[in-house]
């Protein structure tokens, strides 16, 4: 079974039907149930979060999408007018407003707390493991630097006496 539902099952079972012979022209719709996300992250990356990350994709105007769906082409003049309006909208920058420093700090701290809630914190066993690895690495590096220092000191004393 695939994400495409019964259409894919029928195509596999029949074998003779191809995408061009279907009424939809090879396109199928996928109906999904809304996903209830946990309040706190579980440590697993989900498919819906990756799909939601593409929110900055350009969205077509409804009139353009409707005309393409019905097969009716738009005039060049209306397309040019729409593109000029879009460029004018992008070119006009919002006025710079004065930011209250207290409100800025409050908003910043609110965002920090929100981001800290998203962090997946280690449990006690993981913390002990990470701490012991860091301490072992630190002891190794201290011994390495001390050994290099002692060795180079002896070498300098032998050469320069």
UniProtKB/Swiss-Prot annotation:
Matching PANTHER family: PROTEIN TRANSLOCASE SUBUNIT SECE
GO biological process: intracellular protein transmembrane transport; protein secretion; protein targeting; protein transport by the Sec complex
Protein name (database record): Protein translocase subunit SecE
Region (Disordered): 1-80
Intracellular or extracellular location(s): Cell membrane
Organism: Mycobacterium tuberculosis (strain ATCC 25618 / H37Rv)
Role: Essential subunit of the Sec protein translocation channel SecYEG. Clamps together the 2 halves of SecY. May contact the channel plug during translocation.
Superkingdom field: Bacteria
Compositional bias segments (type: Acidic residues): 1-12
GO cellular component: peptidoglycan-based cell wall; plasma membrane
Lineage: Bacteria, Bacillati, Actinomycetota, Actinomycetes, Mycobacteriales
């Amino acid at each position: 079974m695939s994400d495409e539902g019964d259409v894919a099952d029928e195509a596999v079972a029949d074998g003779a039907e191809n995408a061009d012979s279907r009424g939809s022209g090879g396109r199928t719709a996928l109906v999904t149930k809304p996903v209830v996300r946990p309040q706190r992250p579980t440590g697993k990356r989900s498919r819906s979060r990756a799909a939601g990350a593409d929110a900055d994709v350009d969205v077509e105007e409804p009139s353009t999408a409707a005309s393409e769906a019905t097969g009716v082409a738009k005039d060049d003049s209306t397309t040019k007018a729409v593109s000029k309006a879009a460029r004018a909208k992008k070119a006009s920058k919002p006025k710079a407003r004065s930011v209250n420093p207290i409100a800025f700090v409050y908003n910043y701290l609110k965002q920090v707390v929100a981001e800290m809630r998203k962090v997946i914190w280690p449990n006690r066993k993981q913390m002990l493991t990470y701490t012991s690895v860091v301490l072992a690495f630190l002891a190794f590096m201290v011994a390495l630097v001390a050994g290099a220092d002692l060795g180079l000191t002896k070498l300098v004393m032998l050469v320069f006496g």
